[in-house]
Amino acid sequence: MRNGGICMAGDFIITGGRPLSGTVRIPAAKNSVLPLLAATILCSGPVRLRNVPPLADVDTSLRLLRGAGGAACRQGGDVLVERAPTTCRLDAEAAAQMRASILFCAPLLARLGRAETVLPGGCRIGARPVDLHLSGLKALGAQCREEGERLILTAPSGLRGADITLRFPSVGATETLLLAAATAQGSTTLRGAAREPEIADLAAFLCRCGASIRGAGTSTIRVEGRRTLAGCTFAPMADRIVASTYACACAAAGGRVELTGCAPATYAPLLEILAQMGCSVECGPETAVISRFGALHGVGKVFTGVYPALATDAAPLLAAAMLTAKSESSIEDVIFERRFVCAEGFAAFGGRVETAGRTLHIAPARRLSAAEVRAPDLRGGAALVIAALAAEGTSRVRETGSIDRGYADFARKLGQLGAQITREMRPGA
C-alpha cells in the first residue's frame, strides 16, 4: 500500500449475481487532470484544481512536480500547486510508472529551456511511441537526444511557433504541442489534432490562465503564444471512462444506475451500443440513467476510434457487458493492438471469447461462473471486475493496483450500488 492510501495492492473479492441500484457522481477525469497538472508548470501563480479524485496517477504527477522543485499538495478534495518546478529533471522512478509523464516535458522545456526524463511507463496495451510528441517539439525549435534510458530536450533559442500537421490525431501529442505552444514566441497552427473533450478542457484551463487558443475540440487548433501565464482555480471535466465503467457494470449485472455530473454526450457511442443491446438509457445534460432488467442481445461488430467514436478505453468494459448477451458481438480496437489482454480472464469466467489481431469475438455463453483472475492493466482489470459482478459465485480479482490508477474507491462505490465486493490485502502488499 502506497503512503496516503492512494495505490493499494491486494485482491477484490466479488460475489456476483446481485443487480445494481443507486446513484454515482462521476469525479474529475484522470485524462484531464494529468495534463492540467503538467500545465501548471507554465503558470506564474498558484493553481487550484477542484474535486480531483485520489488516484495513483495523480499521486505520481504530484511526485513529479515536487521532485523537480515544485510545491504541490492535496487540500481536501482539491489539488493545490503553489509553486512551479525549478529544475528540469523529472524523477525517474515516478516518470517510469506513468505514460502521461511525457506531458511534463513540454512545459518544463518552455519554462526552463530544458527537460530530462526517462521513457514513460503505463499500461502495456500496445505500442505507444512518443515520436509524434518529439517531432512536433522539434518543429517548435526543440532539440532531442537519448542517453541510455534518458530523454533530454533542450531549446537553446527558445520555442517558436510553427505550422504542424500530425499524421495521426494523437491525444498525448496534441496536449504536448498545446503546452509547448502556449508560451512559445509567435503563432502555432496544429492540424490533424485530436478532438477529445479532454483537449478542449486543457485549452479552457490554459485560456483561463491567459493563453490564446482557438479551435480546441476540432482538428485544427491555433495558438498565439503568450510570454507568461497566470494561475487560476479550475474544475476539470468529469471522467467519461469512469461513467462508461459504471454503465457497463449495470448492463452486466442488471438493475438501475443513475450517473450524475458527467455529460452523456462525451460517451454517447457507448450509451448507444448499450441501448442496442437491450438496456434502457435515459439522458439529461449532465445525467444518464441506465437500466437493464431483461436479456442482453449482441450487436454484431463495433469499432473503437478517435473521438467522437467509441473510446478505446471503453472497449474492454463493453466487452465484459457483452459476455452474457444472447447473440454474437465483436469489438475491434483500431488504436491499440493489445487492448484485449483481459480476454484470458473473460474465458476463466466461462466467457466464449476469441481474439484475432485487434478484434475480440464474443459468442453467447449460457452463464458465467466464479473464477480467480489477475488484473492485467487499468481498464482490463475494471472489465474483469464487471465480469465478476455478472458471474455466479464468489470470484477473486488479483493484483488490483493497476485499477487504482484510474478508479477511486472502486469497491466502496460498487458496494453502495448493492454489489457484494470487498478488498483483501495480501501479506506484504
What are the functions of these language-model segments?
Residues 2-429:
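Short, structured segments at the rim of ligand-binding sites
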